[in-house]
């Protein structure tokens, strides 16, 4: 429950989160891992309409689905492992230090300081309160409900939630901030002293070994700015719908020493925020963006002369703004690291400044000199009183928090019901705000019910379902360039297809054809499609398999010789594919075909 403090006076606009008071509309506490979709219609249409354009960030044309990012990251990780190095040998005497500032849009119904809607897909300038555009006489009206997702984020990131926090003004002049200042929590944020743990499964650099702990200095509430679009002749279009949407800024300590680990840190924080329903969407859809602070120092010359967030002995840092993907974080840090090392090797000095990075670039570029605390003229906001957080609400939220990603990953890998590989489990957790994982679990539960009559246990079934969800269904999505939609192929339909396949009622080829038919919009039940199209398996006899295998062997004598003499057994799978081509794909069972080929070739 949330209420205004009963002692509120005009001179002391104090707000309080405590038991009692006015009940908020909607669910305050997550009841399951589906929290990110509570009370909202996250259809594929609305997802595509999410605001992906930010100042200095990539626009919609640069959108890369997360599933493709994950595949690319996995390939690059394997390549780095094969090379046996993380950074070029010429950089071995240089220490890189990185701190990250993450800006995430909170999942709320209203803006931070007005009752205007925080909807992300409405007509431009349709959700604008007087305060949002700084009309004279308008004042901020703090919306206590915005604290709920912010508190979930702080608890999930192991922060010390402060009983009292206050708002400050950060002054700067730019067209996206009509008031001439941004309201934030510079001096007294609502959460401090957090941390996250990154392990090898998170994609950290090889040099970080079994894991690394990254400290979080603070998390602060702040208002977002307008969306700005630059046109020719220095003309700007402004959408004030985004002004005062509630953000949290998560500031890590400068304890990261490799580009890969920095990207892994951002990815891990995003996954945690999504898992507890704190944010609207992730970096891939514009709901999260990152700034990175980069410095280098030469190890052989001792400690540096600079400090940042209490960490001393650092080199002069620069800040790279508005990075809108995990790959951008990694590549921008690499580019800035190389630039700073080159400058220092040439006898130059690094200037503290704000820099930018463009998608596909190998260099950063100067935007402006780096502003400091004095430049921003931070001051307490006189129109807003302190925010007081009741301990009862803190413990209530903590008790209701969903399972966090690391514990969930462990369950998906170790529980025999699922038995997923680490890579597949991680992908399910990270894809589609957790919706893909919910779908997977539903399909597993349905398949277990369908196979109750089988004497064998369900061991391995969860892994099979994971493969179909990620690779077969995921492949259709990628090929069609479509966003995830759990209703396109209902979990019931997928489970029925896998059930028929596991009972040898249909072949693998038939199963894939069934999936494609449902994916393309066939509304018939799986059993009806199988009956109408006569898809039930009519098994080949042993003699028919032998005849097909001998025909394929006659057509591919060189392949047979390589398998027989060089023991290149992996090529048997290719011959199985040839049997399917010359035989009836809906009757050829890959396992039986392989058994016959092995018998004939390796006898």
From Swiss-Prot:
Keywords per UniProt: ATP-binding, Ligase, Mitochondrion, Nucleotide-binding, Protein biosynthesis
Domain of life, source organism: Eukaryota
The record's annotation in InterPro entries points to: Asn/Gln-tRNA_amidoTrfase_suB/E, Asn/Gln-tRNA_Trfase_suB/E_cat, Asn/Gln_amidotransferase, Asn/Gln_tRNA_amidoTrase-B-like, GatB, Gln-tRNA_amidoTrfase_suB_CS, Gln_synth/guanido_kin_cat_dom
Region Disordered: start and end of each range?
A: 38-61, 72-91
Q: Which GO terms describe its molecular function?
A: ATP binding; glutaminyl-tRNA synthase (glutamine-hydrolyzing) activity
- Biological process (GO) annotations? glutaminyl-tRNAGln biosynthesis via transamidation; mitochondrial translation
What EC number(s) does the entry state? 6.3.5.-
Which EC main class describes this enzyme?
ligase
Q: Does the keyword Nucleotide-binding apply?
A: yes
Remaining remarks: This protein may be expected to contain an N-terminal transit peptide but none has been predicted.
Give the protein family.
Answer: Belongs to the GatB/GatE family. GatB subfamily.
**Under what name is this protein listed?**
Glutamyl-tRNA(Gln) amidotransferase subunit B, mitochondrial
Q: Which organism is it from?
A: Paracoccidioides brasiliensis (strain Pb18)
């Amino acid at each position: 429950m949330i209420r205004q403090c009963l002692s509120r006076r005009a001179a002391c606009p104090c707000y309080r989160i405590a038991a009692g008071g006015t009940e908020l509309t909607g669910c305050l506490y997550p009841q399951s891992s589906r929290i990110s979709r509570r009370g909202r219609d996250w259809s594929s249409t609305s997802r595509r309409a999410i605001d992906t354009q930010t100042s200095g960030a990539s626009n919609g044309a640069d959108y890369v689905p997360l599933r493709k990012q994950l595949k690319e990251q996995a390939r690059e990780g394997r390549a780095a492992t094969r090379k046996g190095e993380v950074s070029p040998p010429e950089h071995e005497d240089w220490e890189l230090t990185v701190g990250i500032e993450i800006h995430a849009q909170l999942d709320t119904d209203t803006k931070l300081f007005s009752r205007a809607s925080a909807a992300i897909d409405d007509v431009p300038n349709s959700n604008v309160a007087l305060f949002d555009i700084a009309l004279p006489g308008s004042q901020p009206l703090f919306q206590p409900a915005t604290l709920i997702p912010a508190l979930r984020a702080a608890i999930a990131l192991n922060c010390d939630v402060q009983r009292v926090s206050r708002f400050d003004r950060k002054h700067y002049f730019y067209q996206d901030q009509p008031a001439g200042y941004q309201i934030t929590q510079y001096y007294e944020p609502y959460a401090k002293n957090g941390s996250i743990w990154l392990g090898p499964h998170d994609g950290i650099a090889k040099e970080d070994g079994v894991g690394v702990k990254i400290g979080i200095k603070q998390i602060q509430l702040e208002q977002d700015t307008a969306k700005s679009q630059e046109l020719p002749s220095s003309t700007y279009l402004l959408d004030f719908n985004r002004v005062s949407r509630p953000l949290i800024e998560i500031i890590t300590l400068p304890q990261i020493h490799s580009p890969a680990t920095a990207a892994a840190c951002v990815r891990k924080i995003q996954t945690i925020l999504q898992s507890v329903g704190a944010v609207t969407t992730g970096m891939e859809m514009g709901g999260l963006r990152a700034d990175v602070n980069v410095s280098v120092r030469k190890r052989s010359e001792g400690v540096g002369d600079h400090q940042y967030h209490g960490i001393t002995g650092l080199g002069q840092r620069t800040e790279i703004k508005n990075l809108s993907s995990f790959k951008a974080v990694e590549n921008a840090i690499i580019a800035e690291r190389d630039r700073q090392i080159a400058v220092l090797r040439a006898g130059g000095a690094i200037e503290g400044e704000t820099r930018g990075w463009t998608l596909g670039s190998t260099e950063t570029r100067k935007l402006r000199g780096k502003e400091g605390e004095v430049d921003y003229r931070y001051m307490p906001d006189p129109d807003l009183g302190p925010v007081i957080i009741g301990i009862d609400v803190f413990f209530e939220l903590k008790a209701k928090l969903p399972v966090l990603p690391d514990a969930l990953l462990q369950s998906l890998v170790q529980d025999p019901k699922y038995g997923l590989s680490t890579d597949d489990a991680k992908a399910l957790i990270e894809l589609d705000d957790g919706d893909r994982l919910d779908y997977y679990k539903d399909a597993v539960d349905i398949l277990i019910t369908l196979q109750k009559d089988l004497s064998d246990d369900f061991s391995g079934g969860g892994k099979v379902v994971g493969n179909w969800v990620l690779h077969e269904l995921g492949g259709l999505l990628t090929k069609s360039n479509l966003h995830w939609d759990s209703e396109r192929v209902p979990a019931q339909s997928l489970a029925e297809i896998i059930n028929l396949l596991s009972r040898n009622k249909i072949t693998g080829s038939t199963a894939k054809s069934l999936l494609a038919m449902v994916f393309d919009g066939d509304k018939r039940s799986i059993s009806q499609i199988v009956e109408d199209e006569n898809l039930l398996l009519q098994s080949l006899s042993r003699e028919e398999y032998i005849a097909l295998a001998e025909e394929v062997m006659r057509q591919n004598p060189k392949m047979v010789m390589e398998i027989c003499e060089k023991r290149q057994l992996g090529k048997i799978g290719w011959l199985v594919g040839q049997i399917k081509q010359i035989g009836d794909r809906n009757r050829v069972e890959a396992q039986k075909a392989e058994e016959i080929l092995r018998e004939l070739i390796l006898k």
